[in-house]
C-alpha cells in the first residue's frame, strides 16, 4: 500500500511547491532582519510576518495532506455545498466592519478569514462539476450562460467589497476551463470581445494623451462588425456579438464613475505611472528600482537596500517579488519562474492524463489560478499590470492565500494518485 502511494505520487508538483514555501519564508525573514554590519545604520522595521507565516505554513501543509488523501469524488459531491457556503460568506462579509475602506475579512477568534480566497476553490469545483455532467453538451449556448453565471455571481459580490483584483481571478478561471471542456470557440469569442471592448474604452476614456487608443477602439469595433457579417447565417449570435460590445462601450464610462477613488487612481497610475511617482505610483517605481538594482546575481541574502530602507510598504505581501529580485537577482527570479512553470505544466499534463472528467477540468482550473496569480503579481511589481493586491502563491504573507494554495496542490496530488479512476 505504501509503495503504491509513493509510486503514483507526483513529486514534480509537490517539490516545487515546498521549495517556493521555503523561499517565501526566507524572504519574510530577510524583510524583518538587518545584517550585523548594517545595524548601526539601519534599524529593522519589524512586521512580525515571518513568525505568523510559519504557523500558516504548518496549517497549509496539514490541509495539503488532507486534500491529497480524501477521495476526489468527495469534492465533486460537495461542490454545490462549497459554492453555497462561499456565497453566504461573501454576503456576510459585506456587513463586516470596513478595514481601510473595504470589507474583505471576517474576524473569527482573532484570525481574519478572507472568504473571497476560499470562494476561488468553490468556483473551480462548481464549474468542473457542472461542465463534467454528460447532459451539458459543450456546443450548447445554455452551458456557456450557466457557466458564466457560476462565475459572475461571486465576481459581482467581490467587486462590491470592493476588491477588483481578486474578482478578476474568477474571470481568468472561466475561459480556460470552458475552452478545455470544448465549448465552441465562437461562443467564447462572444463573451471575450466585450472584455476587450471595455479595456480599450477605459484606455481611450482615461488617457489624457490619447494617441492611437480611440482609433484602436474604432478598428476593434470594425473587426467585430466584419466577424458578425461573416456569421450572418447565425443571426442570433451576430446580433448578440454586436449588441454586447456596443452595450459594454456605453456602460464602461458609467462603471468608471462608480469605482472607488483608490481603484481609479490605481488604473490611472498604471496607464501613466510617471505622473505620480511620489504618490500612488511610488510602490511601482521603487519596485522597479529594486528589481533593476539586483542585477544578475543579486545583493545577497539580507542585503537588499530597498528592503532595509523600507521603501516598499507592502514588501512582505504584494511586492515580495521585488525583494527576491533585489537580493537574489535575475538568477533567483528565473528560478522562481521555473518552479511555478513546473507546477503549471505538470498540472496541465495531469489534466490530459487523468481519466475522470471532473478531475481533468478541475486540474485546468487550478493551473489557471496559479498562472493568473503569478502573471498579475509579477506584472504588477514590474509595472506591466495595475496594482491589484493579488498575492504571489506560497510566497506572499497571508494565511488565506497560503492555505488555499496548499489545498489546491493537495488536490492535484490527489488526482495524480488516482489518475486511473473514472
Question: Where do the language-model regions lie?
Answer:
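Hydrophobic alpha-helical transmembrane segments of multi-pass inner membrane proteins, especially
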Residues: 16-22, 27-28, 39-279, 325-382, ...
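Cytosolic juxtamembrane amphipathic/interface segments immediately preceding
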Residues: 1-6, 42-44
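A juxtamembrane structural motif centered on a specific transmembrane helix
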Residues: 1, 377-422
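N-terminal topogenic module of multi-pass integral membrane proteins
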Residues: 3, 10-12, 16-19
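Interfacial segments of multi-pass membrane proteins
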Residues: 168, 173-187, 306-328, 391-392, ...
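Helix-boundary and loop/linker segments of multi-pass membrane transporters
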Residues: 5-7, 143-144, 309-312, 354-355
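Juxtamembrane/transmembrane-helix boundary motifs at the membrane-water interface
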Residues: 34-38
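TM-adjacent membrane-interface loops and short helices in multi-pass inner/ER membrane proteins
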Residues: 269-317, 328-332
Amino acid at each position: 500500500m505504501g509503495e503504491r502511494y509513493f509510486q503514483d505520487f507526483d513529486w514534480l508538483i509537490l517539490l516545487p511547491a515546498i521549495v517556493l514555501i521555503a523561499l517565501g519564508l526566507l524572504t519574510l525573514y530577510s524583510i524583518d532582519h538587518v545584517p550585523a554590519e548594517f545595524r548601526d545604520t539601519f534599524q529593522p522595521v519589524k512586521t512580525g510576518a515571518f513568525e505568523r507565516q510559519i504557523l500558516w505554513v504548518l496549517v497549509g501543509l496539514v490541509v495539503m495532506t488532507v486534500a491529497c488523501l480524501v477521495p476526489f469524488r468527495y469534492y465533486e459531491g460537495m461542490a454545490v455545498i462549497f459554492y453555497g457556503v462561499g456565497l453566504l460568506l461573501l454576503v456576510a462579509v459585506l456587513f463586516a466592519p470596513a478595514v481601510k475602506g473595504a470589507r474583505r475579512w471576517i474576524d473569527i477568534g482573532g484570525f481574519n478569514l478572507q472568504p473571497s480566497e476560499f470562494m476561488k476553490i468553490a468556483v473551480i469545483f462548481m464549474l468542473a462539476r457542472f461542465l463534467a455532467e454528460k447532459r451539458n453538451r459543450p456546443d450548447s449556448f445554455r452551458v456557456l450562460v450557466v457557466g458564466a453565471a457560476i462565475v459572475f455571481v461571486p465576481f459581482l459580490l467581490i467587486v462590491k467589497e470592493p476588491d477588483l483584483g481578486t474578482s478578476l481571478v474568477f474571470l481568468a478561471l472561466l475561459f480556460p476551463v470552458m475552452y478545455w471542456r470544448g465549448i465552441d470557440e465562437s461562443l467564447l469569442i462572444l463573451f471575450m470581445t466585450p472584455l476587450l471592448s471595455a479595456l480599450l474604452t477605459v484606455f481611450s476614456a482615461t488617457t489624457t494623451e490619447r494617441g492611437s487608443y480611440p482609433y484602436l477602439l474604432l478598428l476593434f469595433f470594425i473587426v467585430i462588425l466584419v466577424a458578425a457579417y461573416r456569421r450572418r447565417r447565425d443571426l442570433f449570435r451576430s446580433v448578440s456579438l454586436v449588441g454586447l460590445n456596443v452595450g459594454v462601450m456605453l456602460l464602461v464610462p458609467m462603471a468608471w464613475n462608480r469605482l472607488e477613488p483608490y481603484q481609479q487612481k490605481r488604473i490611472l497610475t498604471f496607464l501613466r505611472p510617471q505622473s505620480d511617482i511620489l504618490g500612488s505610483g511610488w510602490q511601482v517605481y521603487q519596485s522597479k528600482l529594486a528589481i533593476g538594482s539586483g542585477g544578475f546575481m543579486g545583493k545577497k541574502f539580507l542585503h537588499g537596500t530597498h528592503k532595509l530602507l523600507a521603501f516598499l510598504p507592502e514588501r512582505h505581501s504584494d511586492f515580495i517579488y521585488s525583494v527576491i529580485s533585489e537580493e537574489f537577482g535575475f538568477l533567483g527570479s528565473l528560478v522562481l519562474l521555473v518552479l511555478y512553470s513546473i507546477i503549471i505544466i505538470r498540472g496541465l499534463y495531469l489534466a490530459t492524463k487523468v481519466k475522470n472528467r471532473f478531475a481533468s477540468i478541475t486540474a485546468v482550473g487550478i493551473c489557471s489560478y496559479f498562472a493568473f496569480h503569478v502573471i498579475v503579481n509579477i506584472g504588477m511589481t514590474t509595472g506591466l499590470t495595475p496594482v491589484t493586491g493579488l498575492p504571489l502563491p506560497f510566497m506572499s504573507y497571508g494565511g488565506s492565500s497560503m492555505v488555499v494554495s496548499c489545498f489546491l496542490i493537495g488536490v492535484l496530488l490527489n488526482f495524480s494518485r488516482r489518475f486511473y479512476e473514472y
